[in-house]
Amino acid sequence: MLEIAIIVAAIAIGSGIALVSGGLVGIGEGYVAGKAVEAMARQPEMEGSIRTTMILGQAVSESGAIYSLAVVLLLIFTVALPLVDRLLELL
């Protein structure tokens, strides 16, 4: 019974860490967008190239956040919930 509780706690901690990483990706994307706007203000003739590079970089970094969200959902719904049900049966 204690083992199940420890596993569920570890899943909760891991899910929290993964969600924090997704939030940090959002902060990074905002920083990149701000710097891209600054670059476009300095060099308006390069606007198309800067925007394309910014969007490509944000798409690549967003994929990490999407994968972390997928891992969190898998951990919670395929591992943690059945273990919680089992733990409640034992009580």
Predicted regions and their residues:
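Hydrophobic, small-residue-rich transmembrane alpha-helices and their short perimembrane loops
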Residues: 1-91
